[in-house]
Amino acid sequence: MGKALIIGCGGVASVAIHKCCQNSEVFEEICIASRTKEKCDALKEKLEGTTKTVIRTAQVDANDVDALIALIRQENPDVVLNLALPYQDLTIMDACLATKTHYVDTANYEPEDTAKFEYKWQWAYRERFEEAGITALLGSGFDPGVTGVFSAYALKHEFDEINYIDILDCNGGDHGYSFATNFNPEINIREVSANGSYWEDGKFIETKPMEIKREYDFEGVGRKDMYLLHHEELESLALNIPGIKRIRFFMTFGESYLTHLKCLENVGMTSIEPIMYEGKEIIPLQFLKAVLPDPATLGPRTVGKTNIGCIFRGKKDGKEKNYYLYNICDHQECYREVGSQAVSYTTGVPAMIGAMLLMNGTWNKPGVHNIEEFDPDPFMDALNRFGLPWKESHDPVLVD
């Protein structure tokens, strides 16, 4: 059917590429491009002979708009799937505009020198993408991504009006390390060490990092402590879900993780301010990333499950209603299928699905759009087909 250019070759990209190759009737050809071409070549070698998808590789600096434009023109893809760093979203969007190519990502733009992510920079491209007749699909991972699809599905099929959304992200996995992150350490630590926030009554209310704690009993995992964080889908859901009064995002963390994180903060290792070290300027957090385990290597040693979903409260036919949509994913099952742990899997599968729905024309809406702005039904069907089956409850335990 078509061709995708996939930028990035980390843990999430590896999953998305595996899933594209399992779906070769749609992804007839892919090009994997990264700053380090050797990683792309190694993945190509691993996959060739197992798929009908034709795989090409390329080297590209995702910070270089001209290089990106040249690569897109050379490969002529139907869609660019951006699985690089959030700092590189805008350069890749610029290249897609210049070449009139559809764009998909999994995380919103964040300036490298400021630990603050929001959609305003990408939403500013709306008119230009619309005029070019191309679509930018923002946030096609799990959270953001599936959480937005869940919200759109709940509104379409279960509610007349949604008033409250609690997004719960639980990782009950154990990788055996004293401290490691399940996705890019730099992005993960910036996210969890920032102030939290939730959206209520038309505005964001800011909290201190890890200030608000709740306990929840997750199916397949058990009771876990979870903490309120700021997360990007709060911003788009507040805009796109009518009737909403409050949205919160909670993520689980173990005591060991939090203790190590506090220690690293106390000695300055989570700082993004440049320092001089032996005559060279380095950023402590980037140095820390270099010495921590690569999330892409955690698959064989991670056991347990993830449970991620949304609890909705609202009204149907004038009556109060509660509803819970969620997915449970097993780390070792993911590893057996694609060589990955479940955190990368739960992001990589939706990334492939979003690209697929643009490529096959199921979703066709020129402009810059968050995922909850599209019909959720094809995406929900694809989740069941491609390894992330969803479950539902009409009588969930609520978060206070």
Model-inferred region functions:
Residues T50-D64:
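Rossmann-fold cofactor-recognition segment
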Residues A13-S14:
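N-terminal Rossmann-fold NAD(P) dinucleotide-binding loop
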Residues K156-D400:
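C-terminal catalytic/substrate-binding lobe primarily of soluble NAD(P)-dependent oxidoreductases
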Residues D61-P77, Q88:
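Conserved Rossmann-fold cofactor-binding substructure of NAD(P)-dependent oxidoreductases
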Residues A107-I134:
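Rossmann-fold NAD(P)-binding glycine/threonine-rich loop
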Residues T36-K39:
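Helix N-cap at the beta1-alpha1 junction of Rossmann-like dinucleotide-binding domains, i.e.
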